[in-house]
Regions:
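Short hydrophobic beta-strand element within catalytic cores of glycosyltransferases
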Residues: 336-339
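Membrane-proximal helix-turn-helix segments that form the acceptor-binding/catalytic region
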Residues: 127, 143-180, 190, 194, ...
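Short alpha-helical donor nucleotide-sugar binding micro-motif in glycosyltransferases
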Residues: 85, 306-311
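N-terminal subdomain of nucleotide-sugar transferases
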Residues: 1-52, 58-62, 114-115
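Conserved acidic donor-binding segment of nucleotide-sugar-dependent glycosyltransferases
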Residues: 351-352, 356-363, 372-378
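Aromatic "clamp/platform" in nucleotide-sugar-dependent glycosyltransferases that forms part
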Residues: 319
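Nucleotide-activated donor-binding/catalytic signature segment of Leloir-type glycosyltransferases, i.e.
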Residues: 272-299
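Conserved donor-binding/catalytic core segment of Leloir-type glycosyltransferases
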Residues: 1, 218-237, 243-248, 258-261
């Protein structure tokens, strides 16, 4: 049984929910499990978009369960999950992510139902750790002075960080209460080990969205001196650092352009602007960069892939990450890459062999490595080729699903 915070395509269709805009990597893994004859697949989704209460939808050998738990108390949430557990009686309770309260509630429900030994938690991001880096590189002025939009929505930078800290407390309780976690980087292993030194850590790499396995980046087909980033809308994605790097490069590369996918919060102006957006707008104006920035909006998997292939370099300027899927996607396409050396990124990419890693708060280093790629086509090709070879091993679909099932078997046999 899986507990997730976003539906797969199959779940969305069966439960009349909107198509998922995120979590495409979950689709790849769930599809593999649903096609196996030796697996009965149960998918549990807390969502305010479902009908009230608990709903069960059966399709073939799968069961999709939605719970509308909006504004529910902790006790109500735990009771709802307990109801599901006692009806389904799963062999494995696989919780994807620790970022949300429902993960904590499921562990409590499992404890009350005497099923704690069946629980395994996959590490995605670790919000308690992310909170420590949330304001990285943001001047105090913009941290302390909320925008009009922030005041109206009660959504200041400080509140965003405080919310991560609060969720981090539930996260700690979740990790302290489980015997098994699944991770994939030295960073998540270290963070989990600090919280629960006795936990059994199982290694399992992620599988990417299907479309990224079928294409390869080519210099001849890209827009020269173009950079692609996958997100920019909140501080930890480090867009402000990229702007400073581009400012250092624009005179040397007059045709440099940056393409940005995802939410556009950081680019909105006027009363819609966030405090972080105001800082971004200040940098754009200061360095005269507006004509070089191109916002693409939310892209589906195929559109993302095409933008990767059209761009000369992929940059991941985040101030903290575990193992960003966008980096894996760029690697498996064989792109030239520059990424901030934060969190678990160095578990994915080898500096100088598969791309370049740099100190996250040093935009001058980011600018330097971008120029190293722009100026050396052969180096771009060699780094991209090595990155692709590494990513094909890391994101091997058959190997990853086999190892995941082995983890499930080991947990069940241990009991």
């Amino acid at each position: 049984m899986w507990l997730c915070n976003t539906p797969t395509t199959n779940v969305a269709k069966a439960c009349n929910l909107p198509e998922p805009a995120q979590g495409g990597w979950l689709i790849s893994v769930s599809d593999e499990l649903e096609h196996r004859k030796d697996v009965e697949f149960i998918f549990v989704l807390p969502t305010s978009k479902a009908i009230e209460g608990i709903s069960y939808v059966e399709k073939d050998r799968s069961t999709y369960i939605t719970l509308n738990l909006k504004n529910s108390s902790d006790e109500t949430m735990i009771h709802a999950f307990g109801t599901v557990l006692n009806r389904i009686k799963p062999d494995i309770i696989h919780i994807w992510g620790t970022e949300y309260k429902h993960s904590w509630a499921m562990t409590k429900a499992a404890e009350q139902s005497e099923m704690s030994e069946k629980v395994v938690v996959s590490i995605q991001g670790l919000v308690g750790m992310i909170a420590k880096h949330y304001m990285g590189g943001i001047p105090g002025k913009y941290q302390l002075l909320p925008s009009f939009r922030d005041i109206v929505r009660k959504d200041t930078l400080k509140k965003q960080r405080d919310d991560l800290i609060r969720r981090g407390e539930y996260e700690k309780e979740t990790l302290k209460s489980v015997k098994h976690v699944i991770g994939r980087t030295f960073w998540d292993k270290a963070c989990v080990g600090l919280i629960n030194p006795e936990v059994n850590y199982h290694f399992n790499n992620e599988t990417l969205r299907e479309t990224f396995y079928t294409s390869v980046w080519k210099y001849e087909n890209c827009e020269k001196h173009s950079i692609f980033i996958s997100q920019s809308h909140y501080p930890i994605k480090g867009f402000h650092y990229l702007l400073e790097a581009v400012a250092m490069l624009k005179d040397s590369y007059e045709d440099i352009n940056v393409y940005i996918s995802g939410y556009d919060n950081a680019l909105k102006t006027g009363i819609l602007s966030t405090a972080y957006g105001k800082y971004v707008q200040y940098l754009i104006k200061k360095y005269d960069l507006s004509s070089r920035l191109h916002y693409l909006g939310m892209l589906n998997a195929e559109e993302m892939k095409q933008q990767f292939l059209k761009s000369e370099i992929f940059v991941s300027p985040s101030v903290i990450e575990n193992s960003p899927n966008s980096l894996g996607e760029a690697m498996i396409l064989g792109m030239p890459i520059v990424a901030a050396n934060v969190g678990g990124v160095s578990s994915m990419l080898v500096h100088g062999k598969e791309g370049y890693l740099y100190q996250s708060d040093a935009p001058y280093l980011l600018a330097y490595y971008i120029s190293q790629l722009f100026d050396d086509r052969e180096n771009e090709y060699e780094l991209g080729k090595n990155a692709r070879e590494h990513a094909l091993r890391t994101h091997n679909k058959e190997k990853n699903i086999r190892e995941l099932i082995d983890i499930y078997k080991n947990i069940t046999e241990e009991r």
